[in-house]
């Protein structure tokens, strides 16, 4: 059986564009991109995920000399290699190496010592709001998004690449969840090094059908014949997987140190998850059976499994009520200086706060003290984060996405 063309669905029902949003910016800057990438040595951290692998797909068009990819997901690296090797339009450099490891490991540091990378892009990040369910999950997230990123920057400062990129998120603008504020801290961290070597980042929209996303979950639930659950009141900006890699490549190569890139998307381009879900079922030719609760949806699913009748598929639409959930999206804050003229479809925040490294070290010490206190809980770390990042207004409902299907 040939599976449906998800990329076609994305173009027709989510982004509503047949051509990449960044096609013109790529074309206008193609000579600059080729000059900076061709015959260069590249390291991609977290390259097995959707955004990292899309960055690689965009990058190899410009003929780098070597490509090293690091990710903790060994199976993901295997699939990345299979996909790249199986694509007749992709030409990998002769030196193409993948290593399943953490970028916080000593073995990884040996890779940095062994190779002289011209371009380094870091996509290793906790990206889910659900990662703030308790202090243990929050510590793991901040360890990855902040502490390990700090150690990497310290290591690179003695032998910096020409271009360093570290991915961020739209949720870093006026953050209301711990994931967003952890990325805001990461932005402050990289800005504190931006005078020493060239560092850029990008905030962008949801990546449609990215690994682990709600929409990707729809496919997994369908494959398992399990019911689907979807918020009815949440709207998001979306880019395609292809576009997610392209915005990161443009930011990495073309940006000035300290720049934060974001896509030019207007309020009229926000898309409701409920609309996407209904359109997806229509695209698949499956009728939805609307359910008022998860319990009802699971009961219908069990019945369907027994009868083998899946002509109507159980879907529970619900109003969002979990901690840290933002019902709208924004890419920049009120006092940001934004350049909307340099690129066709990209905006750039040019005046980001650049703290001193000593301030960042003090913030990290403060957070580690909270984590080391055995009596600390989620509220303790939220309070510490609120004192460090001004404007952080955490939305706490006492409910986590891990409590939902």
Q: Where does each model-flagged region fall?
A:
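Conserved Rossmann-fold NAD(P)-dependent oxidoreductase catalytic core, especially the SDR/UDP-sugar
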Residues: 122, 126-131, 135-143, 147-184, ...
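Helix N-cap at the beta1-alpha1 junction of Rossmann-like dinucleotide-binding domains, i.e.
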Residues: 71-76
């Amino acid at each position: 059986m040939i599976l449906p063309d998800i990329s076609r669905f994305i173009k027709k029902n989510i982004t509503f564009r047949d051509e990449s949003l960044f096609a013109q910016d790529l074309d206008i800057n193609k000579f600059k991109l080729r000059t900076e990438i061709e015959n260069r040595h590249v390291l991609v951290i977290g390259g097995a995920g959707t955004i990292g692998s899309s960055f690689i797909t965009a990058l190899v068009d410009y003929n780098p000399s070597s490509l090293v990819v690091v990710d903790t997901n060994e199976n993901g690296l295997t699939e990345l290699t299979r996909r790249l090797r199986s694509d007749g339009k992709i030409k990998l450099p002769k030196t193409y190496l993948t290593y399943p490891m953490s970028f916080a490991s000593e073995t990884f540091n040996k890779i940095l010592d062994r190779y002289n990378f011209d371009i380094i892009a870091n996509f290793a990040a906790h990206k889910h709001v659900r990662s703030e369910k308790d202090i243990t999950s929050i510590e793991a997230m901040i360890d990855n998004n902040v502490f390990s990123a700090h150690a990497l920057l310290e290591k690179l400062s003695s032998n910096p690449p020409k271009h360093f990129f570290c991915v961020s998120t739209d949720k870093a603008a006026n953050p209301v969840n711990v994931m967003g504020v952890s990325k805001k801290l990461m932005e402050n961290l990289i800005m504190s090094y931006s005078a020493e070597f060239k560092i850029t980042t990008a905030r962008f929209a949801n990546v449609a059908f990215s690994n682990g996303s709600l929409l990707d979950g729809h496919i997994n639930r369908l494959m398992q014949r399990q019911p689907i659950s979807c918020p009815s009141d949440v709207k998001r900006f979306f880019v395609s997987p292809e576009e997610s890699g392209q915005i990161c490549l443009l930011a990495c190569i073309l940006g000035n140190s300290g720049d934060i890139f974001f896509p030019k998307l207007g309020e009229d381009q926000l898309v409701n998850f409920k609309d996407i879900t209904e359109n997806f079922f229509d695209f698949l030719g499956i009728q939805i059976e609307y359910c008022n609760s998860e319990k009802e949806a699971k009961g219908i699913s069990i019945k369907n499994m027994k009868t083998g009748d899946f002509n109507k598929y159980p879907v529970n639409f619900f109003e969002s009520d979990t901690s840290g959930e933002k019902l709208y999206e924004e890419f920049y804050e009120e006092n940001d200086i934004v350049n909307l003229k340099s690129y066709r479809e990209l905006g750039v925040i040019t005046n980001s706060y650049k703290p001193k490294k000593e301030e960042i070290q003090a913030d990290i010490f403060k957070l580690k003290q909270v984590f080391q206190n055995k009596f600390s809980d989620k509220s303790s770390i939220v309070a510490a984060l609120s004192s460090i990042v001004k404007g952080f207004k955490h939305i706490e409902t006492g409910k986590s996405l891990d409590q939902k299907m």
